[in-house]
Amino acid sequence: VEAAWQAGKITLSYFQSGVEVDAKADQSPVTIADREAEIKLRELIRLHYPNDGIEGEEFGREEGTSGYSWLLDPIDGTKSFVQGVPLYGVLLAREGAEGVDVGCVYLPALNEMVWAGRGEGCWWNGRRAKVSETEKIEDACICFTSWMNFAASQRDAVWQGITKKARLVRGWGDCYGHILVATGRADASFDPAMNPWDCGPLLP
């Protein structure tokens, strides 16, 4: 939680500042805020968990010896960040032999911190979080990142079937949509294209 908060402070110092945007090899955007935030996350993990591995979006993988590895996404939703939209987040999770046991998402521009641990429950800004009790898709609020991702992954027909039935469909995307689900403000969030550092922090 502390690491996510510190990395989030770095991102806020660049948010809505006209920060320069570079293109990675896959043409996805990256900024100095992404890089500096991941450097801070790695620094704090090495300080407190020196034997753990680290895998981050911007600087790749460092092997460890403890059997645990940290998954880092310094800015999930860089396109939103660059656009000045506050729905981006700092993501981190710890993964071991039995899967992810701790995950944290911090939304710096909204000052929302959500974390969960195996056997510890889920917490949202210091209070217990729980999912909604909606049972029928006809009553559900559905979130998504981009409808184009469904077409690109040949799941467009599935997506169309879901959205035609749902009560409300909104493009509150990236990690924000999933946090809305975790805190009971939305009922489901769909994203067919995710990396380990995108989905790992959401699993606990």
Enumerate the predicted regions with their spans.
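An extended, acidic
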Residues: 130-204
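Short, solvent-exposed loop/turn motifs
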Residues: 100, 128-130
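N-terminal subdomain of lithium-sensitive/metallo-dependent phosphomonoesterases centered on the IMPase/IPPase/PAP
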Residues: 1-75
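Generic detector of well-ordered alpha-helical packing
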Residues: 35, 39, 58, 74-77, ...
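DPxDG-like acidic metal-binding loop motif
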Residues: 64-123
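Residue-level signal for inorganic ion chemistry
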Residues: 11, 34, 45, 78, ...
